[in-house]
Regions:
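Short, Lys/Arg-rich, polar N-terminal cytosolic tail immediately upstream
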Residues: 1-14
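Membrane-helix boundary elements
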Residues: 14-20, 25-52
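Core segments of alpha-helical transmembrane spans in multipass integral membrane proteins
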Residues: 23-32, 51-74, 86-94
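Non-cytosolic membrane-interface motifs at loop->transmembrane helix junctions
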Residues: 45-52, 82-83, 107-118
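Juxtamembrane helix-break-helix junctions at the cytosolic face
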Residues: 69-82, 103-104
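Hydrophobic alpha-helical membrane segments
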Residues: 84-99, 118-121
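Membrane-helix boundary connector in multi-pass membrane proteins
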Residues: 96-114, 129-132
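Membrane-water interface at the C-terminal end of transmembrane alpha helices
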Residues: 121-136
Length: 136
């Protein structure tokens, strides 16, 4: 195997990447549903009834992401795995762009960078998984 091929190979298997994503999405579900003030504090933004309303709805999306990742963690390489990886990579890239934009415009505090770094790592992981679906 050439060094270029070895460098392009994903560090995590699809299964392990999905398990990590399940844990992160489950934690976000619990925080946003039960204690959204933690997110407001971390991101340095103002909470309130409207923000809490959106947080509860967002929590359910994270529950769905957690379930999707958990129940598809053993999906073999192929079209389904590639589609899941591409969809999650797209979502993570979008979150990275939004997080950086909100931080640069001064709306979100420095804590948003924790989310951005995590989302970027997931975007790279799923992006590489989409390019090299067998996880060789």
């Amino acid at each position: 195997m050439t060094s270029i091929a070895a460098a392009a190979r994903p560090m995590f298997s699809f299964r392990n990447l999905n398990i990590v994503t399940t844990v992160i999405a489950s934690l976000l579900f619990l925080i946003l549903l039960g204690a959204p003030d933690i997110a407001w504090w971390l991101f340095g933004i103002e909470g309130g009834e409207s923000a809490d309303f959106v947080a509860r709805r967002t929590a359910m999306l994270f529950a769905g992401i957690a379930a999707l990742c958990w129940f598809t963690r053993n999906t073999p390489a192929g079209a389904a795995q590639s589609g899941i990886a591409k969809g999650l990579a797209l979502a993570m890239v979008g979150l990275v762009m939004l997080g950086l934009t909100e931080w640069l415009r001064g709306f979100a505090g420095i804590g948003i960078l924790l989310a951005v770094v995590t989302e970027l790592a997931l975007a790279v992981g799923y992006g590489r998984m989409a390019c090299y679906p067998s996880g060789r």
